[in-house]
Amino acid sequence: DGFAYSFQTCIGGLVVVPRYFEDWAELIETLCDKWRVTEKRKLIIYVHNLGYEFTYLIQLLTLRWGDCKALYTKSRKPLTLEFSNGIEFRDSLKLFQKSLARATEGCKHEKMKGDLDYTVYRTPDTPLDDKEFAYCVNDVLGLYEAIERMEKEHGFNAATLPLSNTALVKQEV
């Protein structure tokens, strides 16, 4: 068993930092209701290196939203996870084919240099200092900006953005 101490999320350039999965899931479900999300009208959530988060996240997500359809590039390396409620997770690492630091280069909110000290024991109740909070914010806001930049540079929108860099290259050929 494990737990996450932060579920930072960027929605249209606005960052929220729920500390508990239940709070994050309720936020996502509220957005789904407000935006009338369905299997045909999806809420797409990008996670950089979804495969890394997969083992932990899939347990929480399937308990909450049921089984999902998954598209894998390799065993335990999902490209997408689609739930029947219209929520779809996509791996932005496959889209950019580069680290989050490299994907966010030139963005207003680049990934912060250095890593958090992962030897520090944190729970959802552990206060985040300013540096830790900024690190969480920059990760998701920088990713949002990088995706927006890619959409603008290639004439895509959320519905037409390819799943992977390979698909992007094929479209340009």
Where are these regions (language model features)?
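Gly/Thr-rich phosphate-binding beta-strand-loop-beta motif of the actin/hexokinase/Hsp70
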Residues: D1-C10
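Conserved DEDDh/DEDDy metal-dependent 3′-5′ exonuclease domain
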Residues: G13-L128, A134-N138, G142
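Common nucleic-acid-contacting/processivity interface regions adjacent to the catalytic cores
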Residues: Y121-V173
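Polar low-complexity intrinsically disordered regions enriched in Ser/Thr and small residues
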Residues: Y5, V15-V16, A158
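Generic detector of intrinsically disordered, low-complexity, polar/charged segments
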Residues: T9-C10, K111, K152
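Residue-identity detector for glutamine
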Residues: Q8, Q59, Q97, Q171-E172
